[in-house]
C-alpha cells in the first residue's frame, strides 16, 4: 500500500514537471507562471502602497485588500475581502 502511494506521488510529480516544462516552452517565457504571479503580488513599491505588515497612518496608505490596523505599532493587514 505504501509503495503504491509513493509510486503514484512520484508519477504525479514527474507529470507536473513535464507539463510545466512543456507550458514554459510553449509560451517562450523564462519564468514559470507562479513566479510571475508572485511578482505581481509583491510590486507594492511601484503602486505607491504599503504591502502586508508595512507601516501606515491611514487605510489609503495600504495596498488593495489591506487596511491600516490602528494597534501600536500600526501596520497594513488583510481587510477580509477577496479579489
UniProtKB/Swiss-Prot annotation:
Residues 22-47 form a propeptide. SUPFAM superfamilies: omega toxin-like. Expressed by the venom gland. It is found in: Secreted. GO terms for molecular function: ion channel inhibitor activity; toxin activity. GO terms for cellular component: extracellular region. Residues 1-21 form the signal peptide. Disulfide bonds join 49-63, 56-68, 62-76. Keywords: Disulfide bond, Ion channel impairing toxin, Knottin, Secreted, Signal, Toxin. Coiled coil: none annotated. InterPro entries: Huwentoxin-1. Probable ion channel inhibitor. The presence of a 'disulfide through disulfide knot' structurally defines this protein as a knottin. Belongs to the neurotoxin 10 (Hwtx-1) family. 40 (Jztx-35) subfamily. This is U20-theraphotoxin-Cg1a 1. It comes from Chilobrachys guangxiensis (Chinese earth tiger tarantula).
Amino acid at each position: 500500500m505504501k509503495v503504491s502511494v509513493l509510486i503514484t506521488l512520484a508519477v504525479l510529480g514527474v507529470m507536473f514537471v513535464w507539463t510545466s516544462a512543456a507550458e514554459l516552452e510553449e509560451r517562450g517565457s523564462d519564468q514559470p507562471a507562479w513566479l510571475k504571479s508572485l511578482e505581481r503580488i509583491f510590486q507594492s513599491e511601484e503602486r505607491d502602497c504599503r504591502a502586508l505588515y508595512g507601516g501606515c497612518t491611514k487605510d489609503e496608505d495600504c495596498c488593495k485588500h489591506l487596511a491600516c490596523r490602528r494597534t501600536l505599532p500600526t501596520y497594513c493587514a488583510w481587510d477580509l475581502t477577496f479579489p
